[in-house]
Amino acid sequence: ELYRGELEGKKGITPILFTQFPYATVATTFSATNGVTDSAAAGTALATGNKTKNGAIGVLKDLETPVNSIAVWAKNAGYRVGVATSVSVDHATPAAFYAHAGSRSSYYNIGKDLYEAGFDFYAGSDFLDPTDKGKSESLYDMAEKNGYTIARGYKDYMKKCKKAEKMILFQPEAASQIDRSSIPYAIDRKKTDLSLQDITRSAINFLTKDQDKGFFLMVEGGKIDWACHANDAATTFHEVMDMDEAVKVAYEFYSQHPDETLIVI
C-alpha cells in the first residue's frame, strides 16, 4: 500500500481493496507433517478443511484416502464451478480443488482429474505435462471428448464463450512456447498477455451465463509466492497489486449482487 502510494506520487498509502474488507480472521498454517506447509498441503487444507502431508493433493496424510473440496460439494449441489490461477492449471493450489494425488508433481494425472471433476470453467497458463512426457494421450485431445472448449487468450475466449458448454482458458500459444508454467509477471506484462484480471472477468462471465442458481469460483494469484521465493520485492508488490485488480472484478459483481455474494481472500 505504501509502494502503491509512492507510485502515485503521494505521501502515505493507497489502500488495497481487500485489506478494507469488514471481517478478518486467522488460520494455522502448519501441515499434518511439517511446521512449514507447502502449496499442496495448504491448498488441500483451504479446499477440503483437512491437513495433509506436504506435497499431497486432495488426499489425507496416508496419501491414499481422497477428500473432496468445497468446489466438489458446490458442483454436486448444482452450482456452476470454476478454478483459475495465474500459474499452470495443474499446479498445487488449483489442483487441490479438483484432484487427488499423492504427489503434486503428478501433473499429467492431475490434468486427467481436471476432466474427471467436470467443473464448468478452468483457467491458467497451460498444462505443465500435457502428454505424460510423450507416453500418453494428449490432455488437449481429451478436452473435446469431455465437452470442453479451449480458448487461447481473452480475445479468443470472447469469440468462443457463447457456444461453449464448458471452458478452459489458457494464455496464447506463443506465450506458452516461452513459458507454459505461468502467465508473465505483472511487472513484465505486454498488452497481448493474459492477465489475472482477464481470467477473473472471463470466469464470472462464463459461470453466470444462462443460469441464476449461483456459482463457486476459486482464483489464485500464484506468482506472488514465486516472487517472494526469489526475494524480489518490486515484483512481489506488483503481483499483489495485480491480485487486487482481480479482486476488484469480483467486487464489481458483489456490488451488483450484495445479498448473495461472499468473497473470501
Segment roles from a protein language model:
Residues 1-132, 137-161, 165, 241-242:
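N-terminal catalytic scaffold of extracellular/periplasmic and nuclease hydrolases
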